[in-house]
Amino acid sequence: MSKLQQFPLSKGWSFRDNEATSEDAWMPVPVVPSVVHQDLQANNKLKDPYIGFNELEARWVNEKSWTYKTVFQKPAAPAGSCIVLAFDGLDTFAKVKLDGNVILENDNMFLARRVDVTKALEAEGDHVLEIDFDCAFLRAKELRKQDPRHNWASFNGDPSRLSVRKAQYHWGWDWGPVLMTAGIWREVRLEVYSARVADLWTEVQLASDHQSAQVTAFVEVESVHSGSHRACFTLSLHGQEITREEIGVTENGTAKATFDVKEPSLWWPHGYGDATLYEVSVSLVKEQEELHRVSKKFGIRTAEVIQRPDKHGKSFFFRVNGVDIFCGGSCWIPADNLLPSITAERYRKWIELMVHGRQVMIRVWGGGIYEDYSFYDACDELGVLVWQDFMFGCGNYPTWPNLLESIRKESVYNVRRLRHHPSIVIWVGNNEDYQVQEQAGLTYNYEDKDPENWLKTDFPARYIYEKLLPEVVQEYSPGTFYHPGSPWGDGKTTSDPTVGDMHQWNVWHGTQEKYQIFDTLGGRFNSEFGMEAFPHMSTIDYFVENEADKYPQSHVLDFHNKADGHERRIATYLVENLRTATDLETHIYLTQVVQAETMMFGYRGWRRQWGDERHCGGALLWQLNDCWPTISWAIVDYFLRPKPAFYAVARVLNPIAVGVRREHHDWSVTHAQPPKTSKFELWVASSRQQEIQGTVELRFLSVNTGLEVRERIVHENVSIVPNGTTNLIVDGLIDHTVHSEPHVLAARIWVDGQLVARDVDWPQPFKYLDLSDRGLEVKKISESEDEQTLLISTKKPVKCLVFEEREGVRISDSAMDIVPGDDQRVTIKGLKPGDAPLKYKFLGQ
């Protein structure tokens, strides 16, 4: 017997181009996991592909094959034990050879692979491990040619990508480069053991009154020899053991223990309670000797997707522990094109930003990867709900028998790997594949329920989303809701706003509607929508090396924006709304204002609709992050620098948010007439679970003078509806013949004497306003070792006051509207005494 030992094979690797034959061609690999682009850079064979036009200089890598090699000593293996070579991820077509003998062939990036090498390592001394990585780009093209009858309809990247189980964004997307990586992208190690815990998971039954829970822990055991193994289960909370139980392992290698938990501490998304995590541990024992120990954290909670008929159609919203949750959040793409470079610390910083921005859900998009454990651990610990796509995106995938088998293994592996995470509340079959079906005119008869028929149509991928994947989720994570696609709703068109989720791209893409009416364009759950903006100047300084290229329409800036038609779309939204500028810094700022306003108009209205029989169940903006330094829809750039939209969204997602908006008049139509009157509305949105009392004030302030143009409106002792919307004014009227000068509507709400939220509605568009000479004052009123407080005041209304984003500095608020008589405080952490003050900019400055 032997206790499980692990020997990571992270050092001592070398690699070379497969076409090279000389020994001199081998180059050292600093550390594994890695991909070839990282290793080429480390050997000065490749420039940073994220800078300038270097992506083009890296294109040769995409069509190459590579070999990785290491030499290792056979680990000591006591009698009765085995030696296993374990790969957590190989990217992608990999032939693994041990001492010249092929022991494994891999064609799926998303699968872990294990090979028993006990006999292969019988000889003492050195052993040579080689991995040949074939070119995925060329293999995909070969596979496509083998099936010319399949309709290879797709958006983004070469359509041949659909034949390969590799991160689809590697073929390039409308926000990322074409970087076809290859390599040992997750850990590789040797394991020596006589028996091991192959899997540990829990199933939780929470009583309806939440006063008790039943936790059943399951274990699967692999052993070299059958025998009297015992599983010692322990249940802990905050490091303190609650209970334990010892169970004999059955002949088929399973054991389970059931624990009754009284008055359990529930797992909640942040803002609703503590994200409490229990820990279950199992010690595998034989003859009083511990052979292997595994621990996993889990949460006690319920999670449902509520779909029920109502006056708007059919609802789609999330309920956790019996509480309806408005899921304001973001979509997530891989945080780097070179995946092994993402550290656990970097993952956690991203999720901390989500919490700082009051976002409660993150959608792991289907064109990337099933994320690293540290991503989900951070979501568990910080209370962020996860919408998890399976890795299919924007295409009509083929369904060859061997590909279906690979997909089944991939889905089983990843559902089993991730099922203990309480943050994951939904599995979704794909991203926009049903939209591809619609646009390509592929066959989809929702009434045909025979899966074998689906395989015979020109849209065979339906079999994956409506049979294979739901069966896997039902078998391995039966308590998690499954949704066939995003967007999708009961087989109706994907743009149907009455059912399921929808991707609303008629702002930016599509009909390019005015962002001021975004709230009228939504559906039951808006799982994608967005607006592009430039990143901050410091990010552009990173990838634009030549000062002469730092102007808005430069070649290199266009190259770093992969969105089709971005020039026309950015220009359209800028010229419709703002006084444009030709200098780069102002141009950056103006695009950020447009993005912030777009997100605000969408989120604000959709959150208000939550209170109307859950008309809108949530909004996940496209997108939170970037995979390289670029110009995109991200609200936080590659270097974790928030754009103004990040703060605009955070304010709208405040637990208590006041909203005010006037009727939108479109000045761009033919023969537009100035309105004589405009309607306005005032409301409060609350995610609090109890009714509260508040005082709401609405002021009407001249843009030109800062003075009140009419008597303010005050609602005292207002009863704020719990977890919903309280409409205070639905038929307000502005008489432009009486109050002709442009003015803002400035709303505030106090609860228990504390000012908790603000909103300012402006005359649209901004380009018609004179925003000069604001009388803004930003004054430091306190300072400590790493924190400063600023007091901001103004004589006239100020639009979108944005502070500089600096490395290691966190700002409590930015992209703020400031009005006279309402001084605001901003806390800055990480700025030390003597540091230069943060620069700031506002509209019209």
UniProtKB/Swiss-Prot annotation:
- According to its UniProt record, this protein's enzyme class is hydrolase
Give this protein's Gene Ontology molecular function annotations. beta-mannosidase activity
Q: Enumerate the catalysed reactions.
A: Hydrolysis of terminal, non-reducing beta-D-mannose residues in beta-D-mannosides
Identify which residues the record assigns to the active site: E432 (proton donor)
Pfam annotation, one family: Mannosidase_ig
Please give the pathway this protein is involved in.
Glycan metabolism; N-glycan degradation
GO BP term, pick one: glycoprotein catabolic process
Going by the UniProt annotation, this protein carries glycans at N252, N717, N723
Q: Which UniProt keywords apply?
A: Carbohydrate metabolism, Glycoprotein, Glycosidase, Hydrolase, Polysaccharide degradation
**Which Enzyme Commission number(s) are listed?**
3.2.1.25
Matching entries from SUPFAM superfamilies are given as:
(Trans)glycosidases, beta-Galactosidase/glucuronidase domain, Galactose-binding domain-like
Record family assignment: Belongs to the glycosyl hydrolase 2 family. Beta-mannosidase B subfamily.
**Cross-referenced PANTHER family, in alphabetical order?**
BETA-MANNOSIDASE
Q: Mention any additional remark.
A: In contrast to clade A beta-mannosidases, which are likely secreted, clade B proteins appear to be intracellular.
Biological role stated in the UniProt entry: Exoglycosidase that cleaves the single beta-linked mannose residue from the non-reducing end of beta-mannosidic oligosaccharides of various complexity and length. Prefers mannobiose over mannotriose and has no activity against polymeric mannan. Is also severely restricted by galactosyl substitutions at the +1 subsite.
Protein name per UniProt: Beta-mannosidase B
